[in-house]
Each structure stands twice: as C-alpha cells, then as structure tokens.
Regions:
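Extended active-site neighborhood of metal-dependent phosphoesterases/phosphodiesterases
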Residues: 28-30, 57-62, 98-167
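Short gly/ser/thr-rich secondary-structure transition/capping motifs
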Residues: 21-22, 70, 147-150
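Residue-level detector of conserved, well-ordered beta-strand and adjacent loop positions
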Residues: 7, 42, 159
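Alpha-helix C-cap/termination motif
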Residues: 9, 13, 81-82, 118-119
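N-terminal active-site segment of His-dependent metallophosphoesterases
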Residues: 25-102
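N-terminal export signals
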Residues: 4-25
Length: 167
C-alpha cells in the first residue's frame, strides 16, 4: 500500500515538473496544409432534469442537464469562428425525464437541433441510445436534419477534402 502511494505521488510530481510534459516536436499544420476539418460534439444530453436526482435503485446522481444547451450553443459559436468543413454530433443529443412525454422529448430535440442549425455548414448526426428515450427512430429523423443527400439516413458516407467519412 505504501509503495502504491509513493508511486502515485511520484507520478504526480513528475507531471508537475518541467520534465513531465512530453513535447513531440510536432506543430499544427497551416490552414493551407489542412486537408479537411470538422466540428465535433457528443453527449449534449439536453434536458430539463433536476441537477440532483435518484434512479430506480436509489442511487443519487448530480448531473447538470440544464446547462447543456447553453454549453452546446457555445460550442457551435466556436465552430462558426473556426469554420470547419462540416459539423457532426455523435449521439445522445437529448435526454428526457423518467416521467417525460413524447411531446416534451420531441420539444427538447427541436431546441437542441435549432442550436445546431446555427452552424451554417453541412451538419450530420449519429443517433445515440438516449436519442430514443420516449421517441422512435422516425421521430428522431423527423426532428433532426443531416445535410446533403444524407437526409433521413442513420448510416451514410460522404467525402470532404478527399477524405471519406463513414457514419
């Protein structure tokens, strides 16, 4: 046990020292050298849940779903400044309360999709497990919009900058 504490402490001190950070010598490519770029968001979990709640097993959770939409709006604003080739969200776009209705859940999806639509370039979605809480796949597809010919699809591929992206 004492050996473990010593090793953990030593690693922490090493990370804080000037020798603890590895420098690869790599630099970011210039804008002219970038082949393709994209904005990426995942697990937004937009919902109006109390920050402190208990699940069916009585386990307490401290999650701040009510802050997710504003954080996502900031992420989209950052993407707008960087101007990537496209933006993609990788699932769990919304969440829902245990007692939530289909209409309430679709409303949450509409709100977070409206924030995503502030990105002026091509936008794509990957459906996550929470995206189907209280709604169907058809509901999800009807209230989100992939760009180009990927509208209404859950599996697709597209090419940007000579790179093929497969979803």
């Amino acid at each position: 046990m004492q050996r473990r504490v010593l090793l953990q402490s030593s690693m922490g001190l090493l990370m804080l020292s000037p020798w603890g950070f590895v420098r690869s010598g790599e630099t970011l490519p210039s804008d002219a050298e970038v082949i393709s770029s994209f904005g990426w968001a995942t697990d937004v979990h937009h919902c109006r849940k109390s920050p402190d709640f208990w699940d069916e097993e009585g386990v307490a959770h401290h999650e701040y779903f009510d802050l997710s939409l504003e954080k996502f709006r900031k992420a989209v604003a950052f993407m707008n400044k960087r101007r990537p080739d496209f933006a993609i969200e990788l699932g769990d776009f919304k969440d829902c309360t245990k007692t939530g209705s289909r209409a309430e859940t679709v409303g949450l999806l509409d709100e977070v999709e409206a924030a995503f639509r502030q990105f002026p370039g091509p936008r794509f979605h990957v459906a996550g497990n929470h995206d189907f809480d209280k709604i169907s796949l058809e509901d999800f597809l009807a209230h989100t919009e992939n760009s180009d010919e990927m509208k209404g699809l859950t599996h697709y591929a597209f090419t940007k900058g000579g790179i093929k992206y497969i979803v």
